[in-house]
C-alpha cells in the first residue's frame, strides 16, 4: 500500500500559507491568507489551482481576527479557549493554550472571594503565553526570504516584539539561542525555524573549540547511527484498512 507522509506540509502562497495534512482516507487542505492582500475569490482560485483534480468539495470560508483578551480573569469570569483568544493555526497553539488556561487556573480556584493578587498572576501568565506564541509565529514570516508579493514584503518589514528581535540577533551574532525554562516552544523549535529559514550565525559557542579533537564528529556520527537504526524499526504510515 502507498505510504502516508507522517507530517503536515506548510506551503508558502501569494498572501499566506497552505496546509496539507495527510489523513487515512484523504488529504486535508486549507489556505490561511491575509484579506488585506488577497480577496476571497482570488484565494479560492489559488487553492483550487494548487489542488487540481484532487479537490473533493467547495472550500469553506472561516474568518477570524487574531488577538487575545486584555484580562483573561475578570471578576467571576475566566476566559478559556477561543473565548480567551486565537492566533493563526500555523503552529496549532489553540489546544495547548486552552490546556494552560485550565492548568494554571486550578490552583487559584477560590473557596470564596477571589484573591486579586492571584487574579493578577493568572492574567500575567496567560498574557506571557500568548506573547510567546505570537513571537514564535512572527518568526516564521520575518525570516522568510520571499519578496515576490506585497504580502511577503510587508512581512519582512513588520514590527517585531522586542524579545523576538533580541533572540534573532543573539543567534546571528553568537550562535546561541537562549530560551528560558518553561516557555511554550523549546530551543529546538526556535533553532529549527531560524536555521530552516536561512538565519545564519556569525560565530559559534566557544566551548565547541575546547572539545577534544574528533569528539564532536564522533558524537554526531553515533547520533546519526542511532536515528538510522530507529528508522529501520519503524513502520510506514499507511491507511488503517491497509495496514498489516
How should each PLM-predicted stretch be described?
Residues 1-3:
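Central beta-strand plus flanking loop segment that forms part of the substrate or channel wall
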Residues 11-65, 83-96, 108-111:
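Conserved FAD/dinucleotide-binding core of flavoprotein oxidoreductases
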Residues 15-17, 102, 150, 188:
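Short, low-complexity intrinsically disordered segments
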Residues 17, 73, 77, 141, ...:
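Tryptophan-centric aromatic hotspots in well-structured domains and transmembrane helices
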Residues 33-35, 43-47, 72-74, 92-95, ...:
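Surface-exposed beta-strand edges and their flanking turn/coil or helix-capping segments
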Residues 67-133:
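Conserved mid-domain beta->alpha element of the FAD-binding
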Residues 107-244:
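Long, low-complexity C-terminal extensions of enzymes
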Amino acid at each position: 500500500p502507498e505510504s502516508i507522509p507522517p507530517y503536515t506540509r506548510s506551503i508558502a502562497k501569494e498572501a499566506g500559507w497552505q496546509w496539507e495534512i495527510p489523513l487515512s482516507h484523504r488529504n486535508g487542505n486549507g489556505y490561511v491568507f491575509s484579506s488585506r492582500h488577497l480577496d476571497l475569490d482570488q484565494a479560492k482560485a489559488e487553492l483550487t489551482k494548487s489542488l487540481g483534480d484532487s479537490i473533493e468539495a467547495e472550500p469553506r470560508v472561516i474568518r477570524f481576527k487574531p488577538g487575545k483578551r486584555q484580562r483573561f480573569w475578570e471578576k467571576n469570569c475566566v476566559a478559556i479557549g477561543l473565548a480567551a483568544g486565537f492566533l493563526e493555526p500555523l503552529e496549532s497553539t489553540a489546544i495547548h493554550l486552552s490546556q494552560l488556561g485550565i492548568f494554571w487556573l486550578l490552583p487559584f480556584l477560590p473557596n470564596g472571594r477571589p484573591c486579586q493578587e492571584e487574579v493578577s498572576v493568572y492574567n500575567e501568565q496567560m498574557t506571557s503565553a500568548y506573547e510567546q506564541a505570537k513571537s514564535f509565529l512572527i518568526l516564521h514570516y520575518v525570516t522568510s526570504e520571499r519578496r515576490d508579493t506585497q504580502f511577503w514584503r510587508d512581512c519582512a518589514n513588520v514590527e517585531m516584539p522586542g524579545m523576538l528581535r533580541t533572540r534573532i540577533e543573539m543567534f546571528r551574532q553568537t550562535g546561541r539561542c537562549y530560551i528560558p525554562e518553561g516557555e511554550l516552544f523549546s530551543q529546538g523549535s526556535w533553532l529549527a525555524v531560524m536555521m530552516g529559514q536561512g538565519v545564519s550565525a556569525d560565530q559559534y559557542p566557544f566551548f565547541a573549540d575546547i572539545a577534544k579533537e574528533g569528539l564532536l564528529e564522533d558524537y554526531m556520527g553515533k547520533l546519526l547511527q542511532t536515528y538510522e537504526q530507529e528508522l529501520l524499526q519503524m513502520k510506514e504510515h499507511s491507511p488503517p484498512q491497509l495496514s498489516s
